[in-house]
Amino acid sequence: MATVIRRLEENDSVESFDCGDGPLNGYLREHAWNNQQKSSIGVTYVAVEEAAPRTVIGYFTVASASLAKDALPRKAVRGLPGYDLPMILLARLAVDRRFAGRGLGHALLSEALKIAVRVSEQVGCRCVIVDAYSTAVEWYQRYGFIAIEGGRGSSHRMYLDIRTIKAAQQSRQSGQV
């Protein structure tokens, strides 16, 4: 079955979405649409199957953010100005449990990183940051994310440099990966 990733729409069915995490389920059901349409503080992209184009089976939310230069490793910010650096925040990423283990998380993350590259070419941003759950740290590390200081509560702040993302995308396009 083909999966489509697109922006969240008002009439999408989110009530049956269950990733096994209450706050991630609640965000999609109660906040994603308002944050996107009314508050303009995040944009949510959803995965749907072509056969059920309104039923959300996965999602991610991206927003703009900034990070103090000294929060990143020295080698990552060498030569940059001393003020806060623009970032893309991967604020949420979740897959419905019924669709876990099928590569949907990978597809969602790949789309989020493509969006980050496009944004960086329009307005400039240095990295993608995520505050990962402890259970997701290794998963993000497999994609090149690096742990740094920070995070909220029990989450772990991680970053991935836009230049690294671009290099990986170019390698894939040229058939090197």
Predicted regions and their residues:
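Short amphipathic alpha-helix that is part of the acyltransferase structural core
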Residues: 1-38
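Cytosolic beta-strand hydrophobic patch enriched in CBS
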Residues: 43-50
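Conserved acyl-donor/pantetheine-binding loop and adjacent beta-alpha core of acyl/acetyltransferases
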Residues: 53, 59-92, 100
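A structural microfeature
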Residues: 57-58, 149
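Conserved acetyl-CoA-binding loop-helix of GNAT-fold acetyltransferases
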Residues: 101-115
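C-terminal "cap" of GNAT-fold acetyltransferases
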Residues: 123-135, 149-177
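Conserved active-site tyrosine of GNAT-family acetyltransferases
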Residues: 130, 140, 145
